[in-house]
Amino acid sequence: MAKKDGVIEIEGQVIEPLPNAMFRVELANGHKVLAHISGKMRMHYIRILPGDRVVVELSPYDLNRGRIVYRYR
């Protein structure tokens, strides 16, 4: 599996669902980012609803887009 060099993991809360499995997420520091679901979450049919607390991976190159990698229970 590929190593995750330089990714930033941060907690956030889903604000609204968008088309094509995209979500608007408000991060713990107050920023709002556009995030999509990671492939493994999609494969295991993990549903994400507004209000869910999630972990988002951000690339250091584009801090406005991210990938949702975990949903808290």
Curated annotation (Swiss-Prot):
Q: What domain of life?
A: Bacteria
Gene Ontology cellular component terms for the protein in this record? cytosol
- Ranges for domain S1-like come to 1-73
Q: What is its main location?
A: cytoplasm
What are the UniProt keywords, alphabetically? Cytoplasm, Initiation factor, Protein biosynthesis, RNA-binding, rRNA-binding
Q: Which NCBIfam families match?
A: infA
Q: What does this protein do?
A: One of the essential components for the initiation of protein synthesis. Stabilizes the binding of IF-2 and IF-3 on the 30S subunit to which N-formylmethionyl-tRNA(fMet) subsequently binds. Helps modulate mRNA selection, yielding the 30S pre-initiation complex (PIC). Upon addition of the 50S ribosomal subunit IF-1, IF-2 and IF-3 are released leaving the mature 70S translation initiation complex.
Oligomeric and partner information: Component of the 30S ribosomal translation pre-initiation complex which assembles on the 30S ribosome in the order IF-2 and IF-3, IF-1 and N-formylmethionyl-tRNA(fMet); mRNA recruitment can occur at any time during PIC assembly.
| Protein name (Swiss-Prot/TrEMBL) | Translation initiation factor IF-1
